[in-house]
Amino acid sequence: MASTISAYKEKMKELSVLSLICSCFYTQPHPNTIYQYGDMEVKQLDKRASGQSFEVILKSPSDLSPESPMLSSPPKKKDTSLEELQKRLEAAEERRKTQEAQVLKQLAERREHEREVLHKALEENNNFSRQAEEKLNYKMELSKEIREAHLAALRERLREKELHAAEVRRNKEQREEMSG
């Protein structure tokens, strides 16, 4: 029986209560129905053909034997002197100022970045406008030159026609004078 108790103690360390109950279904019956393991008791409730049922009772911490270690209380804080409190306050103030300076620095960097982006956008817009204006002026100049060249060609053809007409008239007059 002592080996059975030690086996159950080992199982309790390794298995959950449900696993313990399940493992108890196939054990050999014992005359004593109450088992004590450290800070818990296991009572056999009833035996049936389908299996056995047990009740597991945990003892409260106050009922534990003096052998078990007592819970240690949290360590007490030592009294802090006025100088230590002042140092802590100064350190906290310094941390607050540092954090505030970091936030202000981040805001300044963000504003500077926004200014740079805006400046770049304006510069690109101005460049685009200037390029569009230059392109338009070039097209207008080219169109003007083509128009002037076309007009000059028309004038030249008109002058040639007038010269030809004058020559034809002269030739006609000469023929009339000769024939007539």
Curated annotation (Swiss-Prot):
Coiled-coil residue windows: 76-179
Gene encoding the protein: STMN3
Identification of the protein by name: Stathmin-3
Domain SLD: residue ranges: 38-180
Naturally occurring in which organism (per UniProt): Macaca fascicularis (Crab-eating macaque)
Signal sequence region: none
Lineage of origin: Eukaryota, Metazoa, Chordata, Craniata, Vertebrata
Highest taxon in the source lineage: Eukaryota
Keywords: Cell projection, Coiled coil, Cytoplasm, Golgi apparatus, Lipoprotein, Palmitate, Phosphoprotein
Molecular function in Gene Ontology: tubulin binding
Assembly information from the UniProt record: Interacts with STAT3. Interacts with CLU (secreted form); this interaction may act as an important modulator during neuronal differentiation.
GO cellular component, one term: cytosol
